Amino acid sequence: MTRWVPTKREEKYGVAFYNYDARGADELSLQIGDTVHILETYEGWYRGYTLRKKSKKGIFPASYIHLKEAIVEGKGQHETVIPGDLPLIQEVTTTLREWSTIWRQLYVQDNREMFRSVRHMIYDLIEWRSQILSGTLPQDELKELKKKVTAKIDYGNRILDLDLVVRDEDGNILDPELTSTISLFRAHEVASKQVEERLQEEKSQKQNMDINRQAKFAATPSLALFVNLKNVVCKIGEDAEVLMSLYDPMESKFISENYLVRWSSSGLPKDIDRLHNLRAVFTDLGSKDLKREKISFVCQIVRVGRMELRDSNTRKLTSGLRRPFGVAVMDVTDIINGKVDDEDKQHFIPFQAVAGENDFLQTVINKVIAAKEVNHKGQGLWVTLKLLPGDIHQIRKEFPHLVDRTTAVARKTGFPEIIMPGDVRNDIYVTLVQGDFDKGSKTTAKNVEVTVSVYDEDGKRLEHVIFPGAGDEAISEYKSVIYYQVKQPRWFETLKVAIPIEDVNRSHLRFTFRHRSSQDSKDKSEKIFALAFVKLMRYDGTTLRDGEHDLIVYKAEAKKLEDAATYLSLPSTKGELEEKGHSATGKGMQSLGSCTISKDSFQISTLVCSTKLTQNVDLLGLLKWRSNTNLLQQNLRQLMKVDGGEVVKFLQDTLDALFNIMMENSESETFDTLVFDALVFIIGLIADRKFQHFNPVLETYIKKHFSATLAYTKLTKVLRTYVASAEKPGVNEQLYKAIKALEYIFKFIVRSRVLFNQLYENKGEADFVESLLQLFRSINDMMSSLSELTVRVKGAALKYLPTIVNDVKLVFDPKELSKMFTEFILNVPAGLLTVQKLSCLIEIVHSDLFTQHDCREILLPMMTDQLKYHLERQEELEACCQLLSNILEVLYRKDVGPTQRHVQIIMETLLRTVNRTVISMGRDSELIGNFVACMTAILRQMEDYHYAHLIKTFGKMRTDVVDFLMETFIMFKNLIGKNVYPFDWVIMNTMQNKVFLRAINQYADMLNKRFLDQANFELQLWNNYFHLAVAFLTQESLQLENFSSAKRAKILNKYGDMRRQIGFEIRDMWYNLGQHKIKFIPEMVGPILEMTLIPETELRKATLPIFFDMMQCEFHSTRSFQMFENEIITKLDHEVEGGRGDEQYKVLFDKILLEHCRKHKYLAKTGETFVKLVVRLMERLLDYRTIMHDENKDNRMSCTVNVLNFYKEIEREEMYIRYLYKLCDLHKECDNYTEAAYTLLLHAKLLKWSEDVCAAHLTQRDGFQATTQGQLKEQLYQEIIHYFDKGKMWEEAIALGKELAEQYETEMFDYEQLSELLKKQAQFYENIVKVIRPKPDYFAVGYYGQGFPSFLRGKVFIYRGKEYERREDFEARLLTQFPNAEKMKTTSPPGDDIKTSPGQYIQCFTVKPKLDLPPRFHRPVSEQIVSFYRVNEVQRFEYSRPIRKGEKNPDNEFANMWIERTIYTTAYKLPGILRWFEVKSVFMVEISPLENAIETMQLTNDKISSMVQQHLDDPGLPINPLSMLLNGIVDPAVMGGFANYEKAFFTDRYLQEHPEAHGQIEKLKDLIAWQIPFLAEGIRIHGDKVTEALRPFHERMEACFKQLKEKVEKQYGVRTMPSGLDDRRGSRPRSMVRSFTMPSSSRPLSVASVSSFSSDSTPSRPGSDGFALEPLLPKKMHSRSQDKLDKDDPDKEKKDKKKEKRNSKHQEIFDKEFKPADSSLQQSEAVILSETISPLRPQRPKSQVINVIGNERRFSVSPASPSSQQTPPPVTPRAKLSFSIQPSLELNGMMGMDVADVPPPLPLKGNMADYGNLMENQDMMVSPTSPPPPPPQRQQPPPLPSKTPPPPPPKTTRKQTSVDSGIVQ
């Protein structure tokens, strides 16, 4: 038989690629993407578990799994699989899983914005993950992508409030175990800052991007402007040159080279290949350019063709002339400043044409800049622009998509701010400025064209050395723009001349001038008419000076002018001419040789950008020092005045010169100081930011080119001389510069010595060492000087001396150097230069010196002493912290030799100081995190040996140890309670916890060893220990159950559950206390309780017995455990409410403590009682907590009452009051003012009218300012009366008012308050009589099924409805609270199947309150007074339903109609502190048909009497309800009137069968007889008030009544009305003592309805226009008459629509479900709840008018106009309706509405709690949802294996067991 076999190594790990639904208990469901650990395999099936839920193992088809590589570790039980993916891929995968869960939650919460953000991030990560997995990316792109991925993960984690991930520089997650604490802290800081910056960018993308970009660009030394020319829209008509450049409008000068594009006449670039690739980058922009007030991007368009465009005969015209056409200008200041950035935006730059010949291009540019707008007529350029950071090399690397090899590079004219060493240039920028040319023999001014070319001294032209613009080829001669007939043209055209360096000294620029004619024939004959030139090298060997040059214009024959020999010997500028003694301003021509100086003038300006040629004579003199040694001293001094840019260009040559001077004068000291100063000057230059990139050049020079072997002696000597003379005023400044250059001076000294040693094998070693020692001693002596002059130098020494360490130790003993440094620091005068001193120490720690063990031995004690000194004085904390951090960082390293002793030094000197610094620091200090990291690092680096040694360091002073431990415990507790690090720094916090845990355990050992015995016991110390340990254990960051499973697994894997570790330690420490335990009771009960409540089972089991131990301790001491009991009850309440504790804790508490108690001789009984008490309390508290955040306030109230009743029962007054106020607040939120008043009354009852002082717990609220119980009681009464008033419970308010009035009158004598109170009471009495109060309905609700919480399950409650709340609304409200509950259809008690089912079943029906009148009202009293007690102060409620007994009588159905009446008694009267109370007893009675008839008759009589009384009291009442009532009774058409009773009960047969009923029959007859006088009075009143329109109706009624009266008086005798009925106050006859509902209540009294018979009758509709009595008819008749009405009513359809709007959707469904076809009354015996519980009144009473219709005397109902507010409720009288014969009038408590009532006004709606009905969008809740969209088409699932596998193997063999329990990380 085949069986399951363990999988091979390559089959251990896989991913599900299709969903699989388990089909049996053994199978495992899979979702796409689930990773599985596969343990066994069998013919196409696998067995294992998903990594999501490792606890559930099962089988699944192998075809659904894609196997992946994984590393398998361990075997059998300990087998784990680790995916073989890249770490980053694993991180992305886990991140996606974590985010997807949150993403789903965001969807559920409808957080759309965040949902979309997360979706984008998830898509990005999935995309990038695929790219990385594809393995196709080149290394640099992969590196970039990794950066993007990690940045996205970190950003996403932050916005989702997940943990911060810390990484190394390569983006890999840091392993905290291998990283020092300080590095970890710094990594967190960096990560946090980066994420914060990203968040800021995202938050206000535009604004912050501007700021960040500006900051980024400001920090970049070099910038470039990228320009992409998209199109030139200009009507030129000929070829053109488009010249683009940057321009400074303030200085009116161009600041960059031109970018030149040649444009053809066809409107396209001449080089068609570059059609969509016209890109240029303007480089070398720097910070100075950012500071320019304005920068413009200028485009000049030069037409190349004819002189005049309008000339049409092109063949005869000269072509190829450069003519000005126009300009386009755009302000790019914001782009260059980084304020605007949009590389995709195309900018349109409007074109301005040249207006006339005198309109020079430069002038037009300035005009356009000054103008507000340009009339461009649609002409202009389209460009995109973007600012890029970096020089050209960086840009090409970082923006290859923008800048490639084809992109033109236009440099800045001049050097960039930072000259890069490899940037070799030899560019001369020549600008043609202007000229002034005489017209000569011509009648008009000439059309002058200047041609520029470069010639050597032999007259040979240099080819291709002129560059008109970037993006264009080099040319040999440049022709200027021609201005037509302009005498003084101004060109401002710049070109670049680039000549090989060797040709410069032989070359000159030549400018020739020629008149150009527009006619081709004339033009050819025009020769050069003049010439100007300028040499590029001056006579002294320097290059042409920058700036303007006024050139001499020579005239001669054209041929002569072409010969260089003719003019080269002549002066080229007017300045030279003057030097030679000639006048440069002569008006006439002067002849020089064969050339004549013309009076024409011509100016150019030049700018030399050369790294090889200098314009500086002094520098040249130094470089060529051998040619004239006499000037050497002067040259050396002058060097220091030369511009830095010139020096760095010739750095190597200059240094060579200096050291050559030094070496060639080795015997004398003449030049030593000067050379030293020059060297210092050069080193100082390179330190400047502008030349910082020359540092590598200097380093390279020292390493490779420097060769002065004896320089060290001279340099050391000069430096020592300077230091020794530090206090001399003249020397001080030079010494300061020298010390700033110390690093490189020592590099030269050391390199020189090393070279010397290589040549002479360590010769003169001792002398060299001695000279260095003397130098260091001089420096140290200088440090101790107190002179003011030396302060700046000493500061510089502290800053720069550490820079020499790494070089000096190559040629000098490091230990000696360490001693020197120690002395150096110790010599700094106290209180001076503290920051500089600490910075110096920081640099020393960074140096190689500190990594050497021997050197550290010397340096560390000095450093720790310095730190201690400054920390104790709270000086320069930031520097101290940085220094300590760096020291600890070095000591953590494994490559720095032994560190144990050094950690000890730090511990001894600094641990306590650092602790105290942390304690004294505010949480808001920026440094608190750094110091805590330092303290954690010290503790982490301490070994057990260190802890043991720590105590010894305190010596014999016991108090020192106590103080130290006290400080530490308090500090730890504070840090744990209020962590200094953000919550998302999980790794840092966990590392800190791990370190603290070890330290706490180490300190606990000290407690046990030194402070436990009787003599040395320290109570406070132990107390602090326990509080700290519990605080540690209960801190948020250790509660693993709150984390995701992945995070929990990671923490457990790396650190274990630290709560367990410390919990067991606390337990052991407690038991160690022995006889001292009693000192900790009750103080330690709370902390121990906190610990036991942690949801960790093993910890609970281990620590719960401590409670029994505490009980035992207290019992042995006091023979009771009262203190313990009080404390645990108080604390338990706070803890459970705060979220701790669960069902399991309750069970464990019960089990463990009972076990212990039962074993104890004395505690068995009392202990058990206590345990049961706590368990009961816990049940209630857990219920309360579960429901506390529930939207359902009713449940919250129930639980609150359960808890407060429990506290009352166990006499915990303080807790009882606390929960009273919670209940009161809930009531106020719901506007339940009556209940709020009753709740507060419970508090008031606890107080006496006395001067006793209030206990603290009695004044629970800030609102009550009372010192005595009497004061507090008075304040409470005032508030309660206020609430009763708001709840319209004036009777209750009056009762309290009387009690309070007595106090005011007889005790307090506060007549002012008494008067106010009595006024209120008077108002209350008036309200009782005059204000109509809506009467609430009462509903019985049963909760059945195990799905309900314990406080509801299996119980029945009576609910008091809200004002105007119908049963449907109440039911809907109930079902929204329990959406999963099923509504029961019957009112009969449910069976056990329902009670024990796991679901939820709700039974709800209306009950009638049973009146319980106070004794004082058992006499005739006004109905307005009595009506209050019908629905208030009630404790018993009844529900009636009809049942049949005996045979059915088709002629008279009343004879065997019995009523089953159920009486419910609640725990308390309603209303009370809740709007519902539990039913405590249920009693059922059956009422015979005869008794039912008596009740019905009695009610009818009461009804008539009441209405008559009301009309007597208030003659203004409307007559319609009275009409309906009387007509319904007297009209003989009603089914024979009370003839049904006569048929049923007044027969001989009935008397024979029921002889005992004789008295009841007589009573019924008496009631029938009594009806006549009431009716007579009613008809009399009706006759008085009837209108003429209704007179016929009244007369018919009178006729009917006459017949009725005759019959009744004949059969049953005559009754006369008591005389009291006329009394306006309305005293009532005895028969009316059973009072009836006020009509205003809109609610009936009896509790069953005839409709209960039939299962088909429809419940009354919420908006029904019919009168409320209507449903009391048997259904069949009702329906028919209704149908008839419907036919007669043409507006019915409209009305129905209105009704629909008012109806709740819920009711519509209800109606549909229970509305089958009409059927007979007898159809069904089953009682359907929907029938028995219909609330027979409209949602809001709606007034209607009655119209008489023809002779039929039938009444229809028409809707009232909105103004008819005072008309009575709707009424539909029918001929068939009668009160007297309905046997079931009191069934279901739904007696017809008292028609005479005017309904009370609806209350103002304060909040949603006012109405119980659903909100308006209820339609959405039940409307049928649209069908879901079809699922996306996917491929078919993989085929399942044909064989069904056997069940998984039983765990028999060891092998199988081991396979089973594999674990996956």
Curated annotation (Swiss-Prot):
Q: Where is the composition biased (Low complexity)?
A: 1639-1664, 1756-1766
Cytoplasm found in the keyword field: yes
Origin: domain of life: Eukaryota
Segments forming domain DOCKER: 1207-1617
Which portions of the chain have biased composition (kind: Pro residues)? 1825-1851
Per its record, what are the GO molecular function terms?
guanyl-nucleotide exchange factor activity; SH3 domain binding
What are the boundaries of the region Interaction with NCK2 (minor)? Answer: 1837-1852
Q: Where is the composition biased (Basic and acidic residues)?
A: 1680-1694, 1705-1716
Positions of region (Interaction with NCK2 third SH3 domain (major)):
1820-1836
Q: Where is the SH3 domain?
A: 9-70
- PROSITE patterns linked to this entry: C2_DOCK, DOCKER, SH3
Q: Which Pfam families match?
A: DHR-2_Lobe_A, DHR-2_Lobe_B, DHR-2_Lobe_C, DOCK-C2, DOCK_N, SH3_1, TPR_DOCK
Cross-referenced InterPro entries = ARM-type_fold, C2_DOCK-type_domain, C2_domain_sf, DOCK, DOCK1_5_SH3, DOCK1_C2, DOCK_C_lobe_A, DOCK_C_lobe_C
Q: Where is the composition biased (Basic residues)?
A: 1695-1704
Sequence positions bearing Phosphoserine? S1681, S1743, S1756, S1761, S1764, S1858
Name all C2 DOCK-type domain ranges. Answer: 425-609
| Phosphothreonine PTM sites in chain numbering | T1767, T1772
Where does the motif SH3-binding lie?
Answer: 1799-1805, 1838-1843
Location(s), subcellular:
Cytoplasm; Membrane
Alphabetically, which GO biological process terms does the record hold? apoptotic process; cell migration; hematopoietic progenitor cell differentiation; phagocytosis; positive regulation of epithelial cell migration; positive regulation of substrate adhesion-dependent cell spreading; small GTPase-mediated signal transduction
The chain's disulfide connectivity reads none
Task: Outline the subunit composition.
Answer: Interacts with the SH3 domains of CRK and NCK2 via multiple sites. Interacts with nucleotide-free RAC1 via its DOCKER domain. Interacts with ELMO1, ELMO2 and probably ELMO3 via its SH3 domain. Interacts with RAC1. Interacts with ELMO1 and ADGRB1. Identified in a complex with AUTS2 and ELMO2.
Q: Which family does it belong to?
A: Belongs to the DOCK family.
Give the comment on domains. Answer: The DOCKER domain is necessary and sufficient for the GEF activity.
Q: What is this protein's record name?
A: Dedicator of cytokinesis protein 1
As recorded in Swiss-Prot or TrEMBL, the protein's gene is named Dock1
